[in-house]
Amino acid sequence: MLLRFTKMHGLGNDFMVIDLVTQHAHIQPKHAKQWGDRHTGIGFDQLLIVEPPSRPDVDFRYRIFNADGSEVEQCGNGARCFARFVLDKRLTVKKRIRVETRSGVIELDVRPDGQVCVDMGPPRLEPREIPFQAENAALDYQVEVDGCEVELAALSMGNPHAVLRVENVESAPVHELGPKLEHHPRFPQRVNVGFLQVVDRQHARLRVWERGAGETQACGTGACAAAVAAIRQGWMDSPVLVDLPGGRLSIAWAGPDQSVMMTGPAVRVYEGQVRL
């Protein structure tokens, strides 16, 4: 059978989006891996699946697969594209949408200027909720990599993140240290790794090594995690402008137990069909 799909991106973080509300198919990890190949498939960082809700208090269910076929809990840039997609496809007329993910419910607000604001919920800081192997929650942790101690913050934005402060993101060891931390045994579900440069109290630069995808042009949950880590450390004040290789996100966080608010663009690239 042929499935309709839409190619989208949020700051260069690119997605294949499939509507399983009006189409019916059983998509498996092998399909994500096949379609995600940039040489022989469609090519993407993540595959986003739009499904009917499984509970009455939400509008849709949102599933995410990395290009390596692994299913993950959350994707911030994908959430913005999800909101734009369901409106463009007239799957809803609501401008504020409640969406069920593997890690909980998020709220998406499509603004008149086309920007999408995502209520990502509060960050999770307890090690068992990240998950991260540590006895107690702390502002930062020491993790041993190749015999050296690496200082990082660890938290969850619905998916696990490590955040390292660097002097300059251009020279940060993203491709050397990123995969080593991604697969570090203290992160039992692997981890996304952010390399954060603080420019001033409300402006940062960030590169992210995403688990299952490698370095991407942008990572929404990574920007949220970096902003939360920087605010908790006292390095920055909310709201924070985060510049990623693909563009800029605005992140606001009022403090403990408060939701992280992420605002940025979502762009449709093209429509297509793929054989299942």
UniProtKB/Swiss-Prot annotation:
GO terms for cellular component: cytosol. It holds the Pfam family DAP_epimerase. Its EC number is 5.1.1.7. Gene3D superfamilies: Diaminopimelate Epimerase, Chain A, domain 1 (3.10.310.10). Pathway: Amino-acid biosynthesis; L-lysine biosynthesis via DAP pathway; DL-2,6-diaminopimelate from LL-2,6-diaminopimelate: step 1/1. It is an enzyme of class 5 (isomerase). Belongs to the diaminopimelate epimerase family. This is Diaminopimelate epimerase. It comes from Azotobacter vinelandii (strain DJ / ATCC BAA-1303). The gene is dapF.
